[in-house]
């Protein structure tokens, strides 16, 4: 009986450890995606700041 208890605790412990590693990897991936999105957004903002508002290069009067 003691052997089964130890085995069960070992399995549960290893399951919890592997679950925490998976959650950590998911969190890192999410943070990386967030950083990439912010970088893309800042690049778009830089492009839009270069052109004055209301400027259209192909304006026909």
Swiss-Prot record:
User: One GO term of the cellular component aspect?
Assistant: extracellular region
Q: Where is this region: Disordered?
A: 27-61
Query: In its UniProt record, which GO terms are filed under biological process?
Result: defense response
Annotated compartments? Secreted
Sorted keywords for this record are: Amphibian defense peptide, Bradykinin receptor impairing toxin, Cleavage on pair of basic residues, G-protein coupled receptor impairing toxin, Secreted, Signal, Toxin
The protein's matches in InterPro entries, at most eight in alphabetical order, are given as: Frog_antimicrobial_propeptide (IPR004275)
- Where is the signal peptide, in residue numbers? 1-22
Tissues showing expression: Expressed by the skin glands. Expression levels in inguinal glands and granular glands are virtually the same.
Gene Ontology molecular-function annotations: toxin activity
Q: Any chance you could tell me the propeptide residue ranges?
A: 23-48
The answer on whether this UniProt entry bears the keyword Secreted reads yes
Q: What does the UniProt function comment say about this protein?
A: Induces contraction of rat ileum smooth muscle (EC(50)=2.73 uM) but has no activity towards rat smooth muscle from tail artery, urinary bladder or uterus. Binds to both bradykinin receptor B1 (BDKRB1) and B2 (BDKRB2); the effect via BDKRB1 is stronger.
Give the similarity note. Belongs to the frog skin active peptide (FSAP) family. Bradykinin-related peptide subfamily.
Q: What is this protein called?
A: [Val1,Thr6]-bradykinyl-Val,Asp
Native source species: Physalaemus nattereri (Cuyaba dwarf frog)
């Amino acid at each position: 009986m003691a052997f089964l208890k130890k085995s069960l605790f070992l399995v549960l412990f290893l399951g919890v450890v592997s679950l925490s590693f998976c959650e950590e990897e998911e969190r890192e991936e999410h943070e990386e995606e967030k950083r990439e999105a912010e970088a893309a957004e800042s690049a778009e903002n830089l492009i839009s700041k270069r052109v004055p508002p209301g400027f259209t290069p192909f304006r026909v009067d």
